[in-house]
Amino acid sequence: MDTELLKTFLEVSRTRHFGRAAEALYLTQSAVSFRIRQLENQLGVNLFTRHRNNIRLTTAGEKLLPYAETLMNTWQAARKEVAHTSRHNEFSIGASASLWECMLNAWLGRLYQLQEPQSGLQFEARIAQRQSLVKQLHERQLDLLITTEAPKMDEFSSQLLGHFTLALYCSSPARKKSELNYLRLEWGPDFQQHETGLIAADEVPVLTTSSAELARQQLSALNGCSWLPVNWANEKGGLHTVADSATLSRPLYAIWLQNSDKYSLICDLLKTDVLDEQ
């Protein structure tokens, strides 16, 4: 039996709502419904009664519940034990491409410099979209997530690392927003609400990317402008702030599982400033 089906069953039984279960599992509501139908077809019984928004376990569902919990707990324990034997000296850090390029690459270098030679700690720098990394963290496939928005989930702990400043940059001086094409750089799911007030409502980006370096390299060719971290842009050189634009401050968070077995290591690593001179 697919453990993902049991996981979905447990989440629906906990929330009694397909929409909320979908949000918790980072799935669409139709995918959750499909998984429940698959499980019901495999077992040959209905697991839930559905009357509008009133979702309840059937008698068969009530009987399955303790077995599903036991199976999932056993599976999680097995995964954790197997993973521990193969990666006890490994530590995975996940973030978007832009965060790695603009600030985390330097932080990783400082971490290596501060490591004791005998520690044998091996880092994995993982690049992906925030939603994918949150799912990996939830499933214990990732140790630490660095992001601009803290997930609103009880099983996560977070630490505010500080703030960094974004400004709207282009490749030549004294340019206005109306003269430039917009290159959208993804700075987190809540950035769009800030972006809307700083960019014309009808502005359609000619390029959308998660890489600050790619956006920077395309500014001249596309006669464009993009939101870039001020310190990083100054280090790169050759960039100019758009004349009629403002600046924007963004938070940076470290996120980890509350019951992470690497909590002590996480605390030690976060003693090294991530936003060095940002």
Swiss-Prot record:
UniProt GO molecular function: DNA binding; DNA-binding transcription factor activity
GO biological process: negative regulation of DNA-templated transcription; regulation of DNA-templated transcription
InterPro entries assigned to the protein according to its UniProt record, in alphabetical order: LTTR, LysR_subst-bd, Tscrpt_reg_HTH_HdfR, Tscrpt_reg_HTH_LysR, WH-like_DNA-bd_sf, WH_DNA-bd_sf
Superkingdom of origin organism: Bacteria
Keyword Repressor tagged: yes
Residue ranges constituting the HTH lysR-type domain according to the UniProt record: 1-58
SUPFAM superfamilies (UniProt xref): Periplasmic binding protein-like II, Winged helix' DNA-binding domain
Keywords, alphabetical: DNA-binding, Repressor, Transcription, Transcription regulation
Disulfide-bond pairs as recorded: none
DNA-binding positions: 18-37
Function: Negatively regulates the transcription of the flagellar master operon flhDC by binding to the upstream region of the operon.
Family note: Belongs to the LysR transcriptional regulatory family.
Protein name: HTH-type transcriptional regulator HdfR
Highest classification ranks of the organism: Bacteria, Pseudomonadati, Pseudomonadota, Gammaproteobacteria, Enterobacterales
